Amino acid sequence: MQHLVDATRLAMEHKNWYGALALALTMPDICGRISYPHLAKKSEERYVLWFDTYLAAKYQGGFIQEQILARANMYALRCAFLHQGEFDITDQKARQALERFHLTTPYTGLMHNNRSMNIDADGNITNSVLQLSIDIFCEDVCAGIEKWMSDNATDARVASEIRQLGILHAGGSSF
């Protein structure tokens, strides 16, 4: 798993934001599969359980202490970006109230984890957008993955699953 965290950070270092984001959205899937083997065909459930444990606390706040990045929206972003290349999640069945993400590259003074929305005369929320700074978001996911690895460091089954992950071999090596 550490090789994927390192690859995410290397992508950020080289300003390969799309690569970093793709890995950051994929790693919780891997951890969820390993952590919750009894949920074999339920990737969404595994994903949000991992999110609740390792990332949700970083995305709670605001004036009413709401969950700014809800578990369903995190999974919807994963689906929209990895399968369709989009940040608009309106077509994702997993989403919760949010319509789209506005991801930005690093910029001093830019607000991270900032939600914008309109409320119509009937009290309905429209045009709900969550702005995330991609470097902070990806690093938060990396930190969550490292916490997960630490929490599971003595679990032989988890260690065995991690050893089975795909590893790239140096050019010229034979099998």
Feature map (PLM): residue ranges:
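Long, charged low-complexity segments
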Residues: D52-I167
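Amphipathic alpha-helical interface elements
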Residues: M1-R46, Q65-L69, N73-A76, H83-D91
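Lumenal/extracellular "mature" regions of secretory-pathway glycan-modifying transferases
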Residues: A40-L49, Y54-K58
